[in-house]
Amino acid sequence: IILGTVEVPGGFRFKPPYPKPSSIHPKPHFKVTPNAPLDGPHLGFVHGPEDLALDDQGNPVRIDKAFSWENPMSAHGLMHMVISNAYAGDPYKIDTLFMYMANMSWNSSMNTSGVMEMLTEKDNKGDYIIPRIIYSDAYSSEMVAYADLILPDTTYLERHDCISLLDRPISEADGAADAIRWPVIEPDRDVRGFQSVLVDLGARLDLPGFINEDGSPKYRDYEDYIVNHLRKPDIGPLAGFRGDGSAEGRGPVNPKQIEAYIENGGFYVSHVPEEAKYFKPWNNAYQDWAVELGLYDNPSPYIFNLYSEPMRKFQLAAEGVGERLPPEHLKDRLKKVMSPLPIWYSTEIDNEEKGEYPIHALTQRPMAMYHSWGSQNAWLRQIHGLNPLYVPTKIMRDYNLKTGDWVKLSSIHNSITVPVAEMSSLNENTVWTWNAIGKRKGAWALDPNAPEATKGFLLNHLIHELQPNKGDGHRWSNSDPVTGQAAWFDLKVKLEKTTAPRESQPSFEEIKSPVGVGPKSISWKVRV
């Protein structure tokens, strides 16, 4: 912003439906009435302590503690804390956990070994501490084994999807674009697209948005929802080919909209007018175009703020100003991190572990492992069927290592034993590996001796969802104190060369698969 390189040629440019001022976004809603819809969107932007999701006693309302004093601006929620909090009964106990394609007993959780224990541990009456789990997945993932009720989903090739301007579209800086997926393969098993299942459940539960006045289901399935749902008058999930097929952004329902998208290659783009391409937050031409397309209700120009008033409000609350004040044990932290001007500070983990654990360790997911699905693809398995720990040349020399050797990698929380590979184009004090390539035996319809299950591994075992015990009786989440983002990249480790075990460690008991091992060869019925 200071350099003037935002929304200019050659600089950072917003992609429609952005830019938008934070003030026109919803605030988080959390007031629950039995047998009634939530009072508004559950996620949103907070502008001060008055927007926090707290009860009358100041306790977090959400199971993940999002929008609480622990992480006030947690617009994405804290998925990594849900199971841990439910297990601890903090802020309360739950009777049912309902998740969609979140592999929380494996690669999507911190402290994977501990989370698996939380999912199976029983109380002194012999009941599960987390009594019931409902789960939907397209494959037999590690999480399936822990579910009481499974809703089998379809793959991307077997269902409709909507990549909408109302959500996370495929836009570029010069155009507002959305897209669909549509079935090209007939499912050969008893499965339904999860979106269609949600539409069905909405009608069965008599949710107002899913039933007609006579109580009948409003939508046949998700395809019908994509075409006929209106978020506002004349604005639906898809912006293209509305009305008679010529309207874009705003327009009546077009019963042939899906067919029009398919004919157009599955996407639609509305190009930003030449005179509207730059300075979008202050450009009248862009503002008018965005209103016409339905991105805004009214022109919504705004200026960039280097000084954040919402953050200063939280800092003031920590200083004792205002009606809603944070608990005593969080005041000092909020004073520090809620600076209204940009600041940098080292993490507590970095400060505490500089000596014994001197190396930074990162894990990131390859694109093919979105929801871990890449292990279902024969040619991708040849490319990344296992994942070594990538180690920089300096550490390889310091520890007398060569590619193919094994190391014991330890954090303050746990240890793993894994193979290494040299990577010269890497920060000399950082090691890393891919996430989600390592699989648990019995999952994903893979052979128990597959390389994913014997040589693949997770760095997650080293990362706890809680910070080290401070001796103050509080559970400090291993998350950013402002946004609640999981602190995956704060991990510090040490390593030592070791002899090669039969397979990477830790190794877990094979889970019982509901689908068995995948066939050697397969065939599909393809839609033409």
Which residues does each predicted region cover?
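Flexible glycine/proline-enriched surface loops and loop-helix/loop-strand junctions
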Residues: 100, 176-187
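Pocket-edge structural micro-motifs
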Residues: 3, 153, 363-365, 420, ...
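Flexible glycine/proline-rich, aromatic-decorated loop/lid segments
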Residues: 147-179
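Extended redox/cofactor-interaction regions of prokaryotic respiratory oxidoreductases
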Residues: 2-146, 155, 161, 254-399
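Short, well-ordered alpha-helical packing segments
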Residues: 116-120, 144-147, 151, 182, ...
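Short, contiguous, well-ordered secondary-structure segments
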Residues: 166-170, 176-177, 361, 369-372, ...
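Long, contiguous, secondary-structure-rich segments that constitute the structural scaffold
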Residues: 182-183, 188, 192-248, 374-390, ...
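Intrinsically disordered, low-complexity coil segments
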Residues: 55-60, 87-90, 122-129, 170-171, ...
